[in-house]
Every structure is written in C-alpha cells, then in structure tokens.
C-alpha cells in the first residue's frame, strides 16, 4: 500500500457530514425491505451494495463506509438468500478492507498503525448492541462454521446455497484474520512487542475459554482433508471449495506462526499468566496424523506450504529416529543437530538396523509417504538451517528407498515413491 493511500485512509476515517449523509442515504435503501416481497428486498440490497461501491471504491478519494454500513454489508453476506447477494457482499467487503485497512505497517517498518474503533466482524467482549449481538462472530461460532462445512448435505438447491454461503463466510473471515495478523507479526519480529500479537483477532479467537482448541484442530483437519465429488456438485461449488481450501491452508499457517511467535515470547519472558496456555497446533496435528494413516496421506497431498510441510514431517519422523549417542573423543556418531535436518534423517535409514526398526513402527508405506513429501517440499525452497546441497539430499533419498527394499524384498515401492525416485534421479542427472 502506498504512502499516499495510507494518508488518505487516516483522514477519510474521520466522520464527516458527508459520511453521515452517506450512511443515512444508503441504509435507507434496505431499512424498509421487511415490508417488501423477497424479490424486491433482494433488489434493494443489491442496490445498496452498488451505492456503497460507488461512494467508497470508485472515486479516487472515496470515503470509507461507517461501521453501521459495514455491519449491513456483513449481514447480507451472512444471511443473503441468493448467491448473487452473497457473492456481491463478499467481494465488496474484501475490496473495502484492501482499500481501507484498519492495521498496517508504517513507513518506519517497525511501527504499527492501528485505526481506533474500526469495524470488525468479530466480537470478543460483552459490550455489544442488540443489532450486532446475533451478527458478530465469536470464537465458538468459528468452530461451528468449520464443523458445518464438513457436513454431508442433500443435493437440493437450498443445500448448495447454504454450503456456498458457509464457504464464502469462512473465506471472508480468514481474509480478515490474515489482513490483521500479517502486519502485526511482521512488526513483532522486528520489535518483539508481544502485545501486538496478543491483541490480534487470531489470538483473541483461539485464546477464548469457550473454544476447545484440540477439537477445533481435529475438525479443521477433517474439513480440510474432506473430498468433494466433482460429478455430484455444481461447478461453482467445486471451484469455491478450492478457494476455501486455500483459505484454510493460509489460516493453518498463520496459527502455527502465531504459536512460534508465542514460544519466542515465552522464552524471552515477555508473556504473562493472563496470556493463557494451550497446546500448539503442531502437536495436535502430529497426534492426529500419527493415528490415522489415511488422514496423513490426504493431509500431505492437500497441504502445500513447503516450509511447514517439511517441518511437520521432520517432527513426525524425529519421534521414531533413534536418539544420537552423545559425542565423545572416540565416537564418530553424527551430532544431534543432524537429526533435525532432512538429510540427517534420511542418512539414519542407511545406518545398521534403523530402517528395519523405523519401518516396523510406522509401516513401509507411511515411511515412503513421509520422506517423499519431505523431499519434494525441500526441493522448492532454500533452507538456511540445512547446509547440505540438493545433490546430497537427492543421493540420500535414493539411498533411503534402497535401504527399505534391503530390509524386506517384499516391500512394494508405491507409485508416489517411484515418482520421488525419478525426480531425485533427474535432479542428479541435471547437476552432473
């Protein structure tokens, strides 16, 4: 966002006479919809959305909507009776937030600018008027929304609309959480000011005592990994499902980044007892994947953030890798740090009885899935913590698969494993 745009945001947020008249004129379009039939009421709502767009987004110096106007748009998104209304309100809200952010990094890069009393779809307190009470999103509602997105539905038009509405709503809420969390985390990394993240929408949602975080994460994984039959669903639903998956993956990364930042703050001693304690998302994910091989395979197919995918696999495998012997003057055992890198873990498959013991504990298919996905993820980015070259890692992955066959000739290399071996071989050939 440009400096000029930021400046315009600050000045335009001051309520002016024009802003007051804009609110009165636009809201008048939908205040009387209760007395009209549904078709006329829907037309009035569409006209209201267009009026807000014309006043706030079309002009170069458009004025931001008032909180009541935002509230009315959000109400249309949540309770809209047609796909056109839901789509139009979703697009308008996301564009308005891009144009008029409530939190952003200042020009100094270590300062966060926050707009006071900016509207939010979330509510974290009890001081809320009756109009917002049934509209604003609380922590428990988010958990229920995730559960509802994973429910089987009938093939009726009404059911499809309900599912579409839930997906649009989740996409929007994830978008708001990202716009709020990203600048806060960026400045936190520069300043180690924990209060910036403590007050983020994401932290406030997850810190609520009303939320069972473990159950939330289980529902989250189940929803994210659920399949949708393209032959039985409309094209619009299938496409929106893809968009929803993208939003879910981004939100999951944010949750793990929040946990990482919280851990740093804990180590620095800048948190307090009031910040609460909850199990990190990574631990819950690992527990769920450990006891469900199908979920593990599906999750690694769906979740495509290479950095976090690699981290999840490494932590999974570390539980089954023999602990390194403490180094002495006479030993040549690799240092413990080696077991924290992909190449270090792959090398353990070439040492003695390690392949047999690891395969016995988690199964040959799971081993192939884990090391294969970790390898493909590692190929896509540079890891400053791992000094080994890509060529070394390619050689190690080939050696690991060879060791699996050496353990038991009956072990079948999965088609996915063959793809991994082919990729490793091609990389080595290209670098030769």
Curated annotation (Swiss-Prot):
Which residues are listed as membrane-spanning? none
The consequence of inactivating this gene is: Accumulation of DNA damage leading to constitutively activated DNA damage responses (DDR). Increased basal expression of pathogenesis-related (PR) genes (e.g. PR1) and hypersensitive response (HR). Chromatin modifications at the PR-1 promoter that mimic induction (e.g. AcH3 and MeH3K4). Dwarf plants with distorted leaves, reduced root length, early flowering and reduced fertility. Decreased susceptibility to the beet cyst nematode H.schachtii. Mutant plants display enhanced resistance to the bacterial pathogen P.syringae pv. tomato DC3000.
Q: Which GO terms describe its biological process?
A: chromatin remodeling; defense response to nematode; DNA damage response; DNA repair; negative regulation of defense response; negative regulation of DNA-templated transcription; negative regulation of systemic acquired resistance; plant-type hypersensitive response
PANTHER family in the cross-refs: NEGATIVE REGULATOR OF SYSTEMIC ACQUIRED RESISTANCE SNI1 (PTHR37243:SF2)
The record's subcellular locations are: Nucleus
Gene designation: SNI1
| Protein name listed in UniProt | Negative regulator of systemic acquired resistance SNI1
For this UniProt record, the keywords arranged alphabetically read as follows: DNA damage, DNA recombination, DNA repair, DNA-binding, Hypersensitive response, Nucleus, Plant defense, Repressor, Transcription, Transcription regulation
């Amino acid at each position: 966002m440009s400096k000029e745009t930021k400046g315009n945001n600050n000045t335009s947020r001051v309520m002016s006479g024009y802003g007051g008249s804009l609110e009165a004129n636009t809201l008048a379009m939908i205040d009387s919809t209760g007395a009209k039939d549904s078709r006329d009421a829907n037309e009035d709502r569409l006209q209201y959305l267009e009026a807000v767009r014309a006043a706030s987004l079309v002009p170069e110096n458009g004025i931001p909507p008032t909180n009541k106007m935002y509230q009315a748009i959000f109400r249309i998104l949540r309770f809209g009776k047609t796909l056109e209304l839901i789509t139009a309100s979703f697009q308008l809200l996301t564009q308005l937030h891009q144009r008029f952010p409530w939190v952003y990094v200042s020009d100094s890069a270590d300062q966060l600018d926050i707009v006071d009393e900016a509207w939010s779809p979330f509510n974290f307190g009890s001081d809320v008027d009756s109009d917002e009470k049934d509209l604003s999103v609380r922590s428990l509602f988010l958990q229920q929304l995730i559960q509802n997105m994973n429910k089987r539905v009938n093939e009726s038009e009404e059911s499809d609309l309900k599912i579409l509405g839930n997906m649009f709503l989740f996409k929007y809420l994830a978008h708001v959480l990202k716009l709020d969390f990203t600048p806060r985390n960026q400045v936190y990394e520069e300043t180690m000011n924990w209060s910036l993240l403590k007050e983020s929408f994401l932290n406030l949602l997850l810190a609520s005592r009303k939320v069972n975080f473990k159950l939330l994460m289980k529902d989250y994984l189940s929803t994210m990994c659920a399949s949708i039959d393209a032959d039985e669903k409309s094209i619009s639903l299938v496409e929106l499902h893809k968009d929803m998956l993208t939003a879910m993956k981004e939100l999951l990364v944010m949750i793990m980044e929040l946990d990482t930042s919280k851990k740093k703050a804990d180590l620095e001693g800048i948190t307090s007892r009031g910040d609460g304690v909850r199990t990190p998302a990574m631990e819950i994910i690992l527990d769920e994947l450990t006891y469900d091989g199908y979920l593990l395979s599906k999750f690694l197919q769906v979740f495509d953030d290479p950095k976090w995918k690699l981290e999840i696999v490494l932590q999974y495998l570390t539980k089954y890798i023999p602990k390194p012997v403490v180094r002495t003057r006479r030993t040549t055992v690799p240092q413990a740090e080696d077991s924290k890198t992909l190449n270090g873990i792959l090398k353990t498959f070439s040492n003695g009885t390690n392949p047999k013991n690891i395969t016995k504990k988690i199964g040959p298919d799971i081993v192939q899935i884990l090391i294969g996905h970790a390898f493909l993820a590692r190929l896509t980015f540079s890891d400053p913590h791992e000094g080994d070259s890509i060529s070394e890692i390619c050689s190690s992955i080939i050696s690991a698969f060879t060791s699996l066959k050496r353990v038991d000739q009956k072990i079948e290399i999965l088609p996915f494993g063959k793809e991994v071996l082919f990729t490793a071989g091609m990389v080595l050939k290209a670098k030769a």
